């Protein structure tokens, strides 16, 4: 597989498996349960919780890409000075810092704030995309070294790619957002 090589992957086939209701009668304290019509809503709540987890993974890729970029830019010299002292590099690093900090605020608000119907898909979409762009920027900052397997930024980019797929690719998230807007 392309990335997340430290995570085991396998195909599972369930044959003659039993299914269980998400909430048996009265389990959630509201008297609801089998036949209460909230099965899909409960499943979407679980999916949105998982989407926030994927958003955290995208944020983690972005933050690691930022840290690797900052360390490299401080250590690497070009044209008589460390990369971090060149104005265009300062701008790129500053933009990356702003994007990572903004995504972190979104992800943390998603966990701590009220659960908005649109929150989880939007946060996941933004953070997962940022993981890829930050890793790509890190490769650019590292120059030719960024393309070499021995440097961590190549792995970060490979690992970040899957976050846009897990728990709903971009087009599904956009459909969820559109449906929620139409309902509201």
Each language-model region and where it sits:
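Internal glycine-rich alpha/beta core junctions
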Residues: 1-184
């Amino acid at each position: 597989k392309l990335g997340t090589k430290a995570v085991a992957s396998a195909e599972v086939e369930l044959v003659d498996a039993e299914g269980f209701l998400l909430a048996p009668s009265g389990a959630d304290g509201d008297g609801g349960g089998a036949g209460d019509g909230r099965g899909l809503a409960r499943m979407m709540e679980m999916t949105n919780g998982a989407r926030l987890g994927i958003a955290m993974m995208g944020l983690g890729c972005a933050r690691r890409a930022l840290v690797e970029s900052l360390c490299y830019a401080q250590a690497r010299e070009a044209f008589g000075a460390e990369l971090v002292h060149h104005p265009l590099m300062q701008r790129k690093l500053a933009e990356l810092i702003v994007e990572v900090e903004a995504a972190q605020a979104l992800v943390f608000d998603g966990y701590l704030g009220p659960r908005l119907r649109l929150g989880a898909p939007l946060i996941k979409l933004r953070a997962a995309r940022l993981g890829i762009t930050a890793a790509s920027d890190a490769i650019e900052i590292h120059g030719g070294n960024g393309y070499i397997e021995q440097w961590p930024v190549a792995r970060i980019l490979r690992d970040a790619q899957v976050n846009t797929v897990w728990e709903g690719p971009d087009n599904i998230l956009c459909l969820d957002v559109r449906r929620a807007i139409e309902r509201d």
